[in-house]
Amino acid sequence: MGAYKYMQELWRKKQSNVMRFLLRVRCWQYRQLSSLHRAPRPTRPDKARRLGYKAKQGYVIYRIRVRRGGRKRPVPKGATYGKPVHHGVNQIKFARSLQSVAEERAGRHCGGLRVLNSYWVGEDSTYKFFEVILIDTFHKAIRRNPDTQWITKAVRKHREMRGLTSAGKKSRGLGKGHKFHLTIGGSRRAAWKRRNTLQLHRYR
């Protein structure tokens, strides 16, 4: 096994004494830093490489702190107006994962970079910490490499805002196999529309 395989096994055993200590110390360190800051290198090089990171020019890592828990509806004094069925303020669950929220915040802060992917690096009772891989699409090392030219296209701008990253697709219910029947045809809405539309063909 290579070194990265050993690192992967270390991260799989998060309840081991070594990892419990490491994660505890790192969470303390991340709490002292700002909620969004640039990391000099990936905390999990094995995971970052599996998600497309390369230790070369044009690749940037940002570490994001996201507050855990549900989403409170932002209404003044709890006044939602309308019918009682929509009066909920506190027990609202956000449709997307905290990881996709972290990607969105990184993408907003670094508008000139493209979000490639992200991964979990730690959590405590209040926060979750993610590292987001961003790519500078105007760097020659990225533009001249056939493997990374796809992300330099204009259509890839703000992938994280449109649910096109891995974390974003997960909350949209997209995937392959028998677990993803609800999105056959592109999306939940497309699948629902097809199943609930009566088609009366002329010759039937």
From Swiss-Prot:
One of its GO terms (molecular function) is structural constituent of ribosome. The keyword Protease does not apply. Keywords: Cytoplasm, Ribonucleoprotein, Ribosomal protein. GO terms for biological process: cytoplasmic translation. It holds the Pfam family Ribosomal_L15e. Gene3D superfamilies: Ribosomal protein l15e. It is found in: Cytoplasm. It comes from the Eukaryota. GO terms for cellular component: cytosolic large ribosomal subunit. Component of the large ribosomal subunit. Belongs to the eukaryotic ribosomal protein eL15 family. Component of the large ribosomal subunit. The ribosome is a large ribonucleoprotein complex responsible for the synthesis of proteins in the cell. This is Large ribosomal subunit protein eL15. It comes from Hypophthalmichthys molitrix. The gene is rpl15.
